[in-house]
Amino acid sequence: MAKKKKLEEDFLAPATPLPPNVTKICIITDVHIMERNPRCRSDRFLNTTLEKLEYVAKNNDYVIIAGDLFHIHNNSSLLFNTVFTLFNKYRGKWHAILGNHDTFNRNTNALDRCTIGSLYYVGCLDLHFQPWDLAGLTFVPALVNTNPKDIEVDVDNKNILIAHKFFENGFAPDESLTRDDLRRLGYKMAFLGHDHSPYEEEFFRQTTLVRMGSLTRIDTQRYNKDREICYYQIRTTGNGEFEYSREVIPYKPTSECYIEEAYQHMSAVGAEKKEVSFVQIGDVLSKLTRRAGGVNSLDKTLRRLNTPDDSIADIKWRHEINSISYT
């Protein structure tokens, strides 16, 4: 019991005190709240997710979510009430843009049928579709299907882009920003969601690109094996200037929250055989075509494209462990 109490105290420990006039803004992405436990996880995933959200809410004045707060757009009343209880406890702190999982068919006019829309309508969450000001800073949203040409240019290089976009993803160019886009747009910082993998910061002219990765680990991608769970904190006194830092959220090692089979598979990938890149898999899957009579068999299509057997086996296993039908 004492050990459990210590863990809880460590998890909710406040950050180092800052001067009272400093506002702290947390940026996270791809929370993927879900009611059903991912098959690869051995813990109570929903509770783990809510604990992370409470941690960032307690340690920051505001929390900005760069898309995909929920894993599916329409959830049960029980899940809504559970999330509502947490968000209402920290009412006024939550800001978000929509991700592709948050809405029905990416339709922003269907918020009344989405769980995230319910949070918005009861006043627990601010959803943003236009630039908004927060603590003297301007944040500009870009959704997954926003054309980069429609994103306003930051001529003064002082604003912050919050986008649910890949970065130069050849599999999904319509859902991506490129380095040329970033140079043209001219934002001081650009935070991208959508891609769950964490990357090092990159710099394009005067723009700092941040792709921190998802707040949660929901699958068996190899990058989930050893990575830290983090958020970015922006600190400002309200004068338009700010500083930022990468902050680690308390989390359990993958070996403690994944089932043994999933963890062993993640450990083996890349050790005994060449790691299968999901970008490469995406290039293969993009060649699938729909016909009037139905959808081509994934297995037959992969074999017709001379996909290596070990790659096919890995794709099949990832489908099964995540409860996705493989045909």
Regions found by a protein language model. Give the residues of each.
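Beta-strand-turn-beta hairpins that frame and shape the catalytic cleft
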Residues: L18-C26, P131-P141, V155-I160, F204-T208, ...
